[in-house]
Curated annotation (Swiss-Prot):
UniProt name for this protein: Dol-P-Man:Man(7)GlcNAc(2)-PP-Dol alpha-1,6-mannosyltransferase
Functional description taken from the UniProt entry: Mannosyltransferase that operates in the biosynthetic pathway of dolichol-linked oligosaccharides, the glycan precursors employed in protein asparagine (N)-glycosylation. The assembly of dolichol-linked oligosaccharides begins on the cytosolic side of the endoplasmic reticulum membrane and finishes in its lumen. The sequential addition of sugars to dolichol pyrophosphate produces dolichol-linked oligosaccharides containing fourteen sugars, including two GlcNAcs, nine mannoses and three glucoses.
Key word Nucleus present: no
Main location: endoplasmic reticulum
Disease: Congenital disorder of glycosylation 1G: A form of congenital disorder of glycosylation, a multisystem disorder caused by a defect in glycoprotein biosynthesis and characterized by under-glycosylated serum glycoproteins. Congenital disorders of glycosylation result in a wide variety of clinical features, such as defects in the nervous system development, psychomotor retardation, dysmorphic features, hypotonia, coagulation disorders, and immunodeficiency.
This enzyme's EC code(s): 2.4.1.260
């Protein structure tokens, strides 16, 4: 009976993960500049296909090239739904949601596959808690629909972790090679540690590992070079260039640096929330030692690079969640033994509530971080579709939500050129979407009127005298200008 009950709950757990990811997607439907390449590339594959001249990356290539293999996969799975939307003449904005939703389902598929292995190794309660712990944390669910290179690699990494737990070494090596060579070369630290442990424990021999690693490396490298050289119009291995730029030249430091232990005292507590408190208890089970040490070891090695972002270590969160879930299940399984376990069980439930409250707060604040996307939506609401529109989008707007999916009027012209000088050089545009800088706005006082102002967040402060107990500070970030009629 217990087995049947556990089996009956599994669809509910899967539905929980899908529902939480959907809420994050709907509340924050727009994207940031870090997601731009993969999102724009997917758009171009869906709407331009072989017409490379229309592709965004040829005009705005970015600092280093990125692989097209991820966007190709997303476009393939998104295309049926996007085709139906086009037949219904629905806005391309909904296609953006479809594309991001497909990526989210890919991540959830990886999490669900990993959950099955957790269930097989640790039991139903640990697997159930793994799903609840993961769903209530903010960053993993928030990022799972975002077209970041790290997130595109995440489904492959999760499948590799499941193969590692199953001791399916051939599958693990092939998936690892694909993730490292195609998507994120720094994954050699994380997945390499997993392989080294297997080699050290003699679960797989060096000869057998090489028998799979060599052909996997050659085929994956050949695949990415062939596909990406076609789209970039030059012989290229994107992740090789990223490795050279970020690691050898250390140019990633241009985007800021953080202290050596930042991942441990800042990123990890924010990523795991209160679930972090249950990791020591989960270590009572010796089977959790290897996943935990390897995840922390990856973070320690990656800490040597000065430029740090939470999303860079997102692969470690599921491994640590397994240990946290084991700690939670230890208390819940012993609920009837003493009042101490009863109190501990209440703490387990309470920590999920606290994590959910933090996630809701962070999601609410994040909603205001995409003024560019909001401004594009306002433009199409305020200006009649039959109007002749030539819109200029400045850098601040392009980095905070503007994408080709939001260019929904095929008769309008949208321009992101960065070489147009402010002032008289902008008079050719009927509309301007720009940063709300007083000095720049003064240049258009006599030639344009403000059609809309869009706010964004500047910070959050605690206020215990109200509910919710915080204030979100907003200020005007972008303005949408419309050119005044010229005197006849």
């Amino acid at each position: 009976m217990a087995g049947k009950g556990s089996s009956g709950r599994r669809p509910l757990l899967l539905g929980l993960l899908v529902a939480v990811a959907t809420v994050h997607l709907v509340i924050c439907p727009y994207t940031k500049v870090e997601e731009s390449f993969n999102l724009q590339a997917t758009h171009d594959l869906l709407y331009h296909w072989q017409d490379l001249e229309q592709y965004d990356h040829l005009e705005f290539p970015g600092v280093v090239p990125r692989t097209f293999l991820g966007p190709v996969v997303i476009a393939v799975f998104s295309s049926p739904a996007v085709y139906v939307l086009s037949l219904l003449e629905m806005s391309k904005f909904y296609s953006q949601l479809i594309v991001r939703g497909v990526l989210g389902l890919g991540v959830i598929f990886g999490l669900w596959t990993l959950q099955k292995e957790v269930r097989r190794h640790f039991g139903a309660m640990v697997a159930t808690m793994f799903c609840w712990v993961t769903a209530m944390q903010f960053h993993l669910m928030f990022y799972c629909t975002r077209t970041l290179p790290n997130v595109l690699a995440l489904p492959v990494v999760l499948l590799a972790l499941a193969a590692w737990l199953r001791h399916e070494w051939a599958r693990f090596i092939w998936l690892s090679a694909f993730a490292i060579i195609v998507f994120r070369v720094e994954l050699c630290l994380f997945l390499g540690l997993l392989l080294l442990l297997a080699l050290g424990n003699r679960k797989v021999s060096v000869v057998r590992a090489l028998r799979h690693a060599v052909p996997a490396g050659i085929l994956c490298l050949g695949l990415t070079v062939a596909v990406d050289s076609y789209f970039w119009r030059q012989l290229t291995w994107p992740e090789g260039k990223v490795l050279w730029y970020n690691t050898v030249l250390n140019k990633s430091s241009n985007w800021g640096t953080s202290p050596l232990l930042w991942y441990f005292y800042s990123a990890l507590p924010r990523g795991l929330g209160c679930s972090l408190l249950f990791i020591p208890l989960g270590l009572v089970d010796r089977r959790t030692h290897a996943p935990t040490v390897l995840a922390l070891g990856f973070m320690a090695l990656y800490s040597l690079l000065p430029h740090k972002e939470l999303r860079f270590i997102i692969y470690a969160f599921p491994m640590l969640n397994i240990t946290a879930a084991r700690g939670c299940s230890y208390l819940l399984n012993n609920y009837k033994k003493s009042w101490l376990y009863k109190a501990g069980s209440l703490l387990v439930i309470g920590h999920l509530v606290v994590n959910a409250a933090y996630s809701a707060t962070a999601l609410y604040v994040s909603h205001f971080n995409y003024p560019g996307g909001v401004a594009m939506q306002r433009l199409h609401q305020l200006v009649p579709p039959q109007t002749d529109v030539l819109l200029h989008i400045d850098v601040a707007a392009a980095q905070t939500g503007v994408s080709r999916f939001l260019q929904v009027n095929s008769a309008w012209r949208y321009d992101k050129r960065e070489d147009v000088q402010p002032g008289t050089g902008m008079l050719a545009y009927t509309h301007i979407l720009m940063e709300a800088a007083p000095g720049l706005l003064a240049l258009y006082r006599d030639t344009h009127r403000v059609l809309a102002s869009v706010v964004g967040t500047t910070g959050v402060s605690l206020n215990l005298t109200q509910l919710p107990p915080f204030n979100v500070h907003l200020q005007t970030k972008l303005v949408l200008l419309e050119r005044l009629p010229r005197p006849s």
